[in-house]
Design a protein with these regions (language model features):
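Flexible loop/hinge segments that line or gate small-molecule binding clefts
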Residues: 41-79, 172-181, 185
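Hydrophobic alpha-helical segments within soluble ligand-binding/sensing domains
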Residues: 72-97, 171-175, 190-208
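Hydrophobic alpha-helical
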Residues: 23, 33-53, 115, 129-178
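Hinge/cleft segment of the Venus flytrap/periplasmic-binding protein
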Residues: 119, 194-240
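Short, solvent-exposed amphipathic alpha-helices that sit
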Residues: 1, 18, 80-84, 106-126, ...
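Exported/periplasmic ABC-transporter solute-binding proteins
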Residues: 150, 158-193, 201, 209-218
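Short, high-confidence coil segments that cap the C-terminus of an alpha-helix
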Residues: 31, 93-94, 141-143, 184
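Short beta-strand elements in bilobed, periplasmic/extracellular small-molecule ligand-binding domains
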Residues: 1-14, 97-100, 116-137, 144
Length: 240
């Protein structure tokens, strides 16, 4: 396929409104299709309702209520939360504190429900704290520190003091380095390569008039012990 692809990963100003402004700029520039990773699902859904019906749209993330989206591509957020809980249980943790940002989106909320339900089944005490990643806070001793957003996971790793009590979400280069160094005990991940590849194929297929089904990606738990072994290394480092 001969496709002109442009990546826009940073926004000026407040990220939620700025993403909607960037989306509007794309369709006003007569872009044929977009792949979106939602920052603020409610705002983005409202923006998409104004988009021309000819715009092919694929969303990497949870469903946007009321938006006309050709295809959603995402792991199951609740299952990802359960997998993270299983890692906490397997490590013998008896209590945990879950850190959610004030702007936590729908995916983080669903991960939280999956996590807490599984932990309560095993009678593991779970406290929830609302705090933004850039705020000044310290991790409590003797409890697992859990994040359900990549930015918050990074914030916990920065405050971990080298312990292995942080459990989080994401597979950025920095987070994988923190995992290898022992600043994180486990990370719930999906294949970002698959997400990107399938989202582009979906937009192309929509432009060719093909109806697309939503795609559910597998999610996994990466640890320092398995991150360089097959198949986890293929998931985390698909191009190497």
């Amino acid at each position: 396929h001969n496709v002109d692809v442009r990546f826009l990963s940073r926004y000026e100003g407040e990220p939620g409104p700025a993403q909607v402004d960037a989306l509007r700029g794309e369709w006003e520039a007569e872009a044929d299709g977009v792949v979106l990773i939602p920052v603020d699902g409610t705002l983005l859904a409202a923006g998409l309702r104004e988009a021309p019906s000819t715009l092919a749209v694929a969303v990497v993330g949870p469903e946007l209520k009321g938006a006309d989206v050709g295809c959603y591509i995402s792991s199951d957020p609740a299952e990802m939360g359960r997998q993270l809980a299983d890692a906490i249980i397997a490590d013998g943790q008896s209590a945990c504190t879950v850190y959610l940002s004030r702007g936590a989106g729908e995916a983080a909320s669903q991960r939280y429900q999956g996590l807490v339900t599984r932990l309560l089944e095993r009678r593991i005490a779970c406290e929830q704290v609302t705090v933004d990643p850039e705020e000044d806070f310290a991790l409590p001793d003797g409890r697992a520190a859990v994040a359900l957003e990549p930015e918050m996971t990074q914030a916990l790793c920065q405050r971990s003091g080298g312990t292995s009590q942080v459990y989080g979400v994401g597979a950025s280069n920095q987070l994988l380095h923190d995992l290898e160094e022992g600043k994180a005990a486990a990370l719930a991940v999906q294949s970002d390569y698959d997400a990107g590849y399938l989202s582009l194929l979906s937009v192309i297929a929509q432009l060719e008039g093909e109806r697309q089904e939503n795609r559910v990606l597998e999610s996994y738990v990466a640890t320092a012990e398995n991150m360089f072994t097959d198949p986890m290394d293929q998931i985390l480092f698909p191009i190497g």
